[in-house]
Amino acid sequence: MGKIIGIDLGTTNSCVAVMQGTQPTVIENSEGYRTTPSMVAFTKTGERLIGQAAKRQAVTNPKNTIFSIKRFMGRKYDEVPNEKKFASYDVVNEGGDARVKIGEKSYSPQEISAMILQKMKQTAEDFLGEKVTEAVITVPAYFNDAQRQATKDAGKIAGLEVKRIINEPTAAALAYGLDKKKENEKVAVFDLGGGTFDISILELGDGVFEVKSTDGDTHLGGDDFDQVIIDYLADEFKKQEGIDLRKDAIALQRLKEAAEKAKIELSSRTDTEINLPFITATQEGPKHLVINLTRAKFEAMSATLFDKVLEPCRRALKNSKLDMKEIDEVVLVGGSSRIPKVQALVKEFFGKEPNKSVNPDEVVAIGAAIQGGVLQGDVTDVLLLDVTPLSLGIETLGGVMTKLIEANSTIPTRKQETFSTAADNQTSVEVHVLQGERPMASDNKTLGRFHLGDIPPAPRGIPQIEVTFDIDANGILNVSAKDKATGKEQSIKIEASGKLTEAEIEKMKEDAKAHADEDQKRKEEIDLKNSADSLIFSTEKQLSELGDKLPADKKAEIESALEKLKEAHKAGSADAIKPAMDELSKVWSEAASNLYQQPGAEAGAAPQPETNGQQESKGGDGAVNAEYEVIDGDDDKK
């Protein structure tokens, strides 16, 4: 049985971890980093870049570089006006859903997220040396049903069976509390990430992690703080030069990177200089942006964002039915929790110094890996009791939302309630499923609708329609309605996740697999070209050193084979490169044998093209074996 990995699919960065025995391990990606930028780019040649590679080229390719896709997951086009405004890529309306347009093709947010998940899956497979097919994926606690289902769909497209969707602050609490022995510790997890904010109040004790309440804002995170700085820089430059940099995609991407860097620097310094030479040009010549930004100025500009952080904290505390002084620890999670003003607000609100013992960038993935270990049976004596973040109900007479499951109910849960018809001789009812806290149905999020028909005609109020809401451990909802008189039943699995059907998901899975195969083929081609390049270099080098010792006919054969390899390498055809390399290696090997047979030839002088070492080492640690010469070997041994 393969390992169940834990993935923190973040707005800005993603992270993957796995249980190694009884301890969770964060896995480094192929570039050597423990977190991977949640970015996908498409180059002019059609190559797909993910993570660090996508981030590196974002300035020169802003239109085709996708970031913060998590903010579009499970959302309708008309729900994301602000997110759309700040994206450098095109967000289009297709059937009411928000999709990303790259060239002639459009992608659902689930497809883009699946590409990031594929990268995390590959990272885990490289580390474990085995196929990975199962994962626990985290989501913001305040994600609604549609956003959770969209995340599950993304995992499926990436070739992963999502064993559990787990809330980010709950995952962080798992990581924080796994080794804690204190009984009944009450913990507030304050999670301010790249795009979302969650606050969860939990009680930990004797291996039980019970979520008392959760609240948050899915429109508040590091991106919003970056935007404050971007707007400030653009406004200042416009005042000075009369040019709006927001209208230039490349300049805007440079502003975005500079804003993120400035925000990070202001967490450890009181001021920073933002210096962007050649940001634009006019007839007068190039223009440069040089602006000094102080921490005090940044905090003043971000005042409304800081205010938005506290209201969910108040609601979560109230719903937990705990007193402020009962909270034992406040654990900071998410990269944006490093902002000094945020830490000061948390300290002031909770009346205690926040706990910074966990790595805010990695702790969520670690918690997901622990949950994977629990599901696999590797981690025992841990019971996780999570809650649903928002109330669930149906629309009833007068356009009112009638709640069946209240917010902060422990999941999994099942609730039944009996309703009746609103008119005489009514033979069908529409069940309009809603999620939210507002009293009127129209002010809440529609999760789905379905009809129950063939109800026997009767006076209003007589038929009995039993409606059942069933939430699984992932927080995903199933609803059914049954006419008690006839036993006729109708049900719906809520899948308002951008309306992806099973057929669409399967097609996207095939596309994703094809891309993965293409990526692997491209990597193999690059490795082959690099090997050819190395063989050309080493052959030329040793020909110049040993060419006069070779018979003329052998030297001519080598030069001819070398020329063929150069032509194949220049053409870039893998099919031509491989046989050309084999031919050159063969004729060189024959020539080397002749050298051995020459009088006075030393074993150490026999030429060896360095490609042999390189190719042989590929199956191991990727190191390249250097060309070497043994000199007085016996004397050097100690």
UniProtKB/Swiss-Prot annotation:
* Bias (Low complexity): 597-610
Cross-referenced PROSITE patterns, in alphabetical order? Answer: HSP70_1, HSP70_2, HSP70_3
Q: Which UniProt keywords apply?
A: ATP-binding, Chaperone, Nucleotide-binding, Phosphoprotein, Stress response
Give the compositionally biased regions (Acidic residues). Answer: 629-638
A Pfam family annotated for this UniProt entry: HSP70
Query: What triggers expression?
Result: By stress conditions e.g. heat shock.
Positions carrying Phosphothreonine: 196
UniProt cross-references to InterPro entries, sorted A to Z:
ATPase_NBD, Chaperone_DnaK, Heat_shock_70_CS, HSP70_C_sf, HSP70_peptide-bd_sf, Hsp_70_fam
What residues form the membrane-spanning segments?
none
Q: Does the keyword Phosphoprotein apply?
A: yes
Question: Could you tell me the superkingdom of the organism this chain comes from?
Answer: Bacteria
GO MF entries: ATP binding; ATP-dependent protein folding chaperone; unfolded protein binding
Q: Where is this region: Disordered?
A: 592-638
Q: Which function does this protein serve?
A: Acts as a chaperone.
Record NCBIfam families: PRK00290.1 (NF001413), PRK05183.1 (NF003520), prok_dnaK (TIGR02350)
Q: What protein family does this chain belong to?
A: Belongs to the heat shock protein 70 family.
Protein known as: Chaperone protein DnaK
Question: Which species?
Answer: Chlorobaculum parvum (strain DSM 263 / NCIMB 8327) (Chlorobium vibrioforme subsp. thiosulfatophilum)
Phylogenetic classification of the source organism: Bacteria, Pseudomonadati, Chlorobiota, Chlorobiia, Chlorobiales
